[in-house]
Amino acid sequence: CTNYECYKGIYSSFNSMNMFEIAHSLNRQYGTEQWCIYRGKHLMTFVDNHDVSRLATILTNKNHIPLAYGLLFGMPGIPCIYYGSEWGEEGAKAPDNDYALRPCFEEPKPNELTELIREMIAVRRASDALCNGSYRNVVLTNHQLIFERRTDSDRMLVAINASDSEYTADHHELQGSFEKVLSYPCAAEAGKSSCDSAAETAADTSASEDGSADTPETAAGAVTETVTIQGQIVMPPYSAQYFHQV
């Protein structure tokens, strides 16, 4: 079953700068209340496919492309990438045909977005919370969203800032020791971005589909740093961050 409600919610939330839309859909589907309709289910999730305009075309602000993937790999479901979109390929659906959506590529065109998506895949595969955990909104504004994914043994916070300004999120539940296992934009370290370093390790990461084989720090060790959160998370402009509680 494909999750078209959240597909629409992702791009529409960024285009309208209203994160309440996707947060409402995710809570309606996967929240902790008994009435939530897909609790414990694994729908296929996506930001584009062979029937709709590509993400890079439909988003009005291209800075939001990496953040949309940050949402995709942080939210419940089974994330699916449409071929070519991993490097930001564009393509608009026409009224009478889908030719622009289904080009024939002579060769791949990997770029920084491709490497970031590889890192997100590695982090997700290594996290039981991201693969199987519950969903709960923690901080929600028009431009920012922090949500929690949790199992009995694992907890992850996903923080998205769609604004062009830094934002400090305040909440009493933002407490404890965490490993920052994903950080976009990447911080430059020793002449190499942390995303570049993580991409090199991600290719060697193995994990079972249920997320039980590895830990987030082995999947993206190059970007892992331990931070103590005391009621606040600083969210850089146009950022996606994953925090794994230790």
Feature-to-residue mapping (PLM):
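Conserved alpha/beta catalytic core and glycan-binding cleft of carbohydrate-active enzymes
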Residues: C1-A94, T141-N142, E148-T151, V158, ...
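Carbohydrate-interacting/catalytic domains
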Residues: F20, K62, P76, I81, ...
